[in-house]
């Protein structure tokens, strides 16, 4: 089945070669629009679950945009989004977002959640019972408040400092991969914004930042031109579009808005080598990256970009097949081996061919030579 899929992809490559600069046709089942304030929305109806829909607000905002005195605040802000807003105050008259959602069967941590990464922050309210119009309206109001109307109360900020600190402690205590990544980034990304950009930030700043610094970050970067509303599920697309336009059009776009930059990654004349150790990492892993520039966003709607994606998949698949054949030897030269082509670690502005393999302590050079020789 897999080989047939890649054969079909190869045939498709031959067919589209003459139309590479053309844009891919948009799926008509998607409703895509942009409000006057710059906010984009995407709506799609499906019948996967009757009477259920998922709601998202996605933001092109992450820890890479933090100043040195803001390290960790993109992630901190994500936590604060559940601790009071214009229409969800956590009072008897105005329940919190969490209380309102759970009262309607939307579980916090499962259907109500968020994540912060280097370049994006995404909030979701999923498995929403949409047959009740009032529930739909309140769900959109949650996204509306996340966009621009968080309270960011002093007392709530201080309470959340301890929560973040415990999350940081737990991650460092139980996640060797997290600690190794923190060691690797300053070496691999030396001299770039990416050398210190992990969303968890630094606890010195989390424990002591002034309230105003968090509010400044929020109002600088949480704005319509960097946000998108996404609704997918058992909804009437026309009605949902009207609701989105009514709820989100009034959110203001700040004057003299800061430019949202995407930061480059330096090329290197000599190979960069990072040798990392952690007591909880029992297997020696070797990863080889061969970098290349990422495709500009403006070109990602073209047939050329789609074709190049198929080519990358074919290359990674064929190398993977060679690695599997190598692992059939007795004894196996590597403990594990894999190949992929995609984003270079945490940076959107670079892609890479990545070859990863686990090596035997007693035969490091032999494992390395076998994997590279494929």
What are these regions (language model features)?
Residues 23-32, 123-126, 133, 183-227, ...:
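Histidine-acidic residue clusters that define the catalytic metal-binding segment
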């Amino acid at each position: 089945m897999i080989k047939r899929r890649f054969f079909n992809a190869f045939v498709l490559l031959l067919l589209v070669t003459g139309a590479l600069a053309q844009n891919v046709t948009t799926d008509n089942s998607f409703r895509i629009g942009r409000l006057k304030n710059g906010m984009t929305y995407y709506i799609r109806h499906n019948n996967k679950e009757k009477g259920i829909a998922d709601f998202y607000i996605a933001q092109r905002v992450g820890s890479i945009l933090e100043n040195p005195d803001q390290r960790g605040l993109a992630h901190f802000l994500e936590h604060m989004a559940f601790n009071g807003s214009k229409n969800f105050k956590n009072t008897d008259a105005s329940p919190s977002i969490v209380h309102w959602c759970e009262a309607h069967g939307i579980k916090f941590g499962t259907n109500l959640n968020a994540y912060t990464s280097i370049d994006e922050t995404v909030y979701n309210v999923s498995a929403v019972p949409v047959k009740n119009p009032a529930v739909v309206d309140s769900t959109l109001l949650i996204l509306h408040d996340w966009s621009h109307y968080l309270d960011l109360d002093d007392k709530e900020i201080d309470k959340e400092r301890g929560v973040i600190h415990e999350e940081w402690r737990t991650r460092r205590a139980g996640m060797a991969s997290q600690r190794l990544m923190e060691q690797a980034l300053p070496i691999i990304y030396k001299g770039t914004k990416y050398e210190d950009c992990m969303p968890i930030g630094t606890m010195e700043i989390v424990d002591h930042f002034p309230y105003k610094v968090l509010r400044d970050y929020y109002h600088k970067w949480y704005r319509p031109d960097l946000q998108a509303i996404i609704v997918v599920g058992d909804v009437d697309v026309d009605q949902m579009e009207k609701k989105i336009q009514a709820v989100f059009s009034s959110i203001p776009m700040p004057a003299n808005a800061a430019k949202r930059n995407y930061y480059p990654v330096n090329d290197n004349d000599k190979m960069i080598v990072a040798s990392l150790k952690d007591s909880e990492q029992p297997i020696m892993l070797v990863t080889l990256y061969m970098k290349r520039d990422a495709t500009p966003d403006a070109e990602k709607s073209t047939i050329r970009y789609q074709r190049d994606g198929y080519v990358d998949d074919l290359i990674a698949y064929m190398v993977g097949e060679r690695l599997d054949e190598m692992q059939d030897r007795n004894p196996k030269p590597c403990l594990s081996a894999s190949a992929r082509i995609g984003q270079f670690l945490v940076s959107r502005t670079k892609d890479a061919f990545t070859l990863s393999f686990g090596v035997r302590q007693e035969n490091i050079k032999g494992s390395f030579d076998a994997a590279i020789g494929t």
